[in-house]
Amino acid sequence: MSVTVHENRKSRTSTGSMNISLYHKLSHSDCVLNHLNTMRKQRLFTDVTLWAGNRSFPCHRAVLAACSQYFEAMFSNGLRESLDNTVNFHDSLHPEVLELLLDFAYSSKIIINEENAESLLEAGDMLQFHDIRDAACEFLEKNLYPSNCLGMMILSDAHQCQRLYELSLRTCLSNFATLHNTEDFCSLSKDMVLDLISSDELEIEDEQVVFNSVLHWVKEDLDKRKDYFPELLRKVRLALLPSELLKEAVVCEDLIIADERSKLIMDEAVVCKKKILQNDGVVTSLCAKPRKAGHTLLILGGQTFMCDKIYQVDHKAKEIIPKADLPSPRKEFSACAIGCKVYVTGGRGSENGVSKDVWVYDTINEEWSKSAPMLIARFGHGSAELENCLYVVGGHTAVAGVFPASPSVSLKQVEKYDPLTNKWTMMAPLRDGVSNAAVVSAKLKLFAFGGTSIHRDRVSKVQCYDPDENRWSIKAECPQPWRYTAAAVLGSQIFIMGGDTEFTAASAYRFDCETNQWTRIGDMTAKRMSCHALASGNKVYVVGGYFGTQRCKTLDCYDPTSDSWNSITSVPYSLIPTAFVSTWKHLPA
């Protein structure tokens, strides 16, 4: 038919405009794929044969290349296989696993179970079937147990499955007491052992177990691993070991006797041990820092929003026990723990005056003292410990004539307190002044999430402070504008929960401070505004808060490995939590 005749036969409306209809058969791609699968099984138009073991699999190059970058590169880059009619994997790939991958390529379906998940992960990674690798990872994440977590660490590290590695690591940290002398532990790489023993989240109350596990791992392959010993030894909290064991190890342990670096590390630990006993609780050295499993959880609160008492959380008895009275009741303060001490900064007293005061509670001697006052009186601020110093961030002030601020203006000013010198120093200001922000430290940096701006708006920024540069920067945007939220830290993961809107009050998110990526996690059991959170023993705890007229009366726990929340115990009805901190239980004797 000529073009002219075709043009004359085009359908036109009465106005002369084109009348066009788009036909889209939704099932077309499925029909094509199903027919290709039928032709594969009948060996019609197949142009390549894959071999695994002693089995052959006729296929279509185009289908393989469309599903796998591995095959796309193989068939298009002039490799020998692009010309040959066969690709032989020999024994590097199990025939049944290759068959599953090909069935997926031609049907978009695959059954993953406990028997094939690891093999599919390995094969999916090798042949760049990324969907299969990710699906196998997700399956293994949901089937992670103490009995297989060490093996999953090794597998996920080999195939760069970051999420599976992190979950496996957390499970190992939680069960280290039963895993440290297993064959799988001895199969870990040096870097994996370092990830475990250097973590504050390692759930072990007797540091001797960690010390012995390092010796056991090194001696399992002494010739290859003895050079790693000093690096590993430095991550053991040696000053937490009994004095007699420290002395005995220096004299009797061959690995220490034979290495000058190890001797020096042990000598430093002995000196630190002596300083601990002499300095009555002032400890800054890593070798004396207890793991978080050796921490005590303390709630600061009162019968009203005016806080007047400290309470201790008893994990085992699931009780909240009154501990000590505050010497000066206050509200809208911030509290932060450094070692065995709790620092209560600022706030407003009974007459609503804004305070510069800093009260310090010594959990060892159970007594209060005053430290040097802050440079600016403030309330509604945040505080966090960073490299054994205390930082206070943002908030409000009502001190006229010092800074052009009022209770309605959010501060940019940041102060740093050094417990060793008992002095405060002004640091670089926030990029944007905020109050009621969630402030935490992670990976040697400070983070401030959301808050209330100088215009009284909710803030959606993540502000980050780098102490090396003494500078704040904007790292990311929050999933939504936030204020009156809580934050807790597990390694490089920061967990944010709660807020003052219907949409944020029950929500919870995970922020990776190394990649600046957000992930939505399971919602809390209740809506919470002005709640308080901390991390201990690879779990996140949240307490307090309210929404509308409803007060939250439970202490809840979030388990990252199962992405689930549950209530631990009820908070006494008369207690309104104002702060939540974690301190060292004791100094090692």
UniProtKB/Swiss-Prot annotation:
GO cellular component: Cul3-RING ubiquitin ligase complex
Species of origin: Xenopus tropicalis (Western clawed frog)
Domain BTB span(s) in chain numbering: 46-114
Subunit structure: Component of the BCR(KLHL25) E3 ubiquitin ligase complex, at least composed of cul3, klhl25 and rbx1.
Entries under InterPro entries matching the protein: BACK, BTB-kelch_protein, BTB/POZ_dom, Kelch-typ_b-propeller, Kelch_1, SKP1/BTB/POZ_sf
Mapped Kelch repeat ranges: 296-340, 341-388, 389-444, 446-492, 493-538, 539-585
Biological-process GO terms, alphabetical: positive regulation of CD4-positive, CD25-positive, alpha-beta regulatory T cell differentiation; positive regulation of fatty acid oxidation; protein ubiquitination; regulation of translational initiation; ubiquitin-dependent protein catabolic process
Pfam short name (any one): BTB
GO molecular function: ubiquitin-like ligase-substrate adaptor activity
Keywords, ordered alphabetically: Kelch repeat, Repeat, Translation regulation, Ubl conjugation pathway
Role: Substrate-specific adapter of a BCR (BTB-CUL3-RBX1) E3 ubiquitin ligase complex involved in various processes, such as translation homeostasis and lipid synthesis. The BCR(KLHL25) ubiquitin ligase complex acts by mediating ubiquitination of hypophosphorylated eif4ebp1 (4E-BP1): ubiquitination and subsequent degradation of hypophosphorylated EIF4EBP1 (4E-BP1) probably serves as a homeostatic mechanism to maintain translation and prevent eIF4E inhibition when eIF4E levels are low.
Domain BACK positions: 149-250
Domain of life according to the entry: Eukaryota
Pathway recorded for this protein: Protein modification; protein ubiquitination
The keyword Repeat is assigned to this record: yes
Protein name: Kelch-like protein 25
